[in-house]
Design a protein with these regions (language model features):
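N-terminal cap/lid segment of alpha/beta-hydrolase-fold proteins
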Residues: 1-24, 77
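Catalytic nucleophile-loop/oxyanion-hole region of alpha/beta-hydrolase
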Residues: 5-8, 41-49, 61-103
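Short, surface-exposed "cap/lid" segments of acyl-processing enzymes
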Residues: 22-52
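A fold-wide structural signal in alpha/beta-hydrolase
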Residues: 28, 54-61
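Primarily recognizes the serine-hydrolase "nucleophile elbow" in alpha/beta-hydrolase
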Residues: 82-157, 202-205
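Accessory cap/linker subdomain of secreted extracellular hydrolases
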Residues: 130-212
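Short beta-strand/loop motif that positions the catalytic acidic residue
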Residues: 217, 222-225
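Conserved alpha/beta-hydrolase "acid-adjacent" motif
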Residues: 230-239
């Protein structure tokens, strides 16, 4: 495994871990971790997952990105797009990859980022989302969540203590899940992570929804969702299948 800086912003290095397949000039999977945009790390990819991808002939590049609410969602999306551009433009000479064969895979928030960032890049050949969000405009995202309200209520004072003055590029679920839980319980998750008001900034939010951005020019898209996912509705993903 090799750790590489794919981008520097405001003096902060954004890193990715590169896991090489045995064959040179192999296709590459860019893996994007989840965490509600608030926590997570490139290191969270399962080693068994990496092993299976490598054995199937794929290099793997698992990336960090800046985290919310210290960084807003539009900048997070730009980080992911910059990682994809780096893989296409810079990585071939360094890592023996095939730049014409790039796939993007992510889970949960990472699945959302994979769908949104990967669907508009011509050099991306496939996007795979595991329970990623297709639409962040609904009440499920901008109103208090019945699912998360069943859990211990997080006080505002505790949530405020979890916000830093620094840019974060990785954080464990133990460190920051309380902040995510607070936002979901208060119905402020979208407002805090995007900096947009769900009522007043509908057009800006529309542009942050994968179901509004995917078209016939997009690469092959696969979105997997469990039948018992309770945190957000599955039905908005059916638009792709039926559209």
């Amino acid at each position: 495994m090799r750790t590489i800086c794919y981008k520097t912003v405001n003096g902060i290095n954004l890193l990715g871990d590169f896991y090489s397949a045995s064959n040179t000039n192999s296709p590459v999977i860019v893996y994007i971790h989840g965490g509600g945009f608030i926590f997570g790390s490139r290191k969270e990819i399962l080693q068994e997952q990496v092993k299976q991808y490598n054995q199937a002939g794929f290099h793997v590049f698992s990336i960090d990105y800046r985290l919310a609410p210290e960084t807003k969602l539009s900048a997070i999306i730009e980080d992911v797009r910059d990682a994809l551009r780096w893989v296409c433009d810079q990585a071939p000479s360094m890592l023996d990859i095939e730049p014409s064969a790039i796939a993007v895979i992510g889970s949960s928030a990472g699945g959302y980022l994979a769908l949104l960032a990967g669907s508009k890049e011509s050099y991306v050949k496939a996007v795979v989302s595991f329970y990623g969000y297709g639409d962040i405009r609904g009440e499920w995202a901008s109103e208090p969540s019945p699912f998360y309200l069943q859990k211990t209520i997080v006080p505002k004072k505790l949530a405020d203590q979890l916000i830093t003055k620094e840019i974060l590029t990785e954080s464990s679920i133990q460190q920051r899940f309380g902040l995510y839980l607070y936002y979901r319980q208060q119905g402020s998750w979208i407002r805090e992570t995007t900096g947009l008001d769900p009522i007043q900034n509908k057009e800006e939010l529309r542009l942050l929804c994968p179901i509004e951005c995917v078209d016939h020019s997009s690469p092959l898209l696969c979105s997997y969702m469990g039948k018992q996912i309770m945190m957000f509705p599955v039905k908005n993903l059916y638009v792709w299948r039926n559209g």
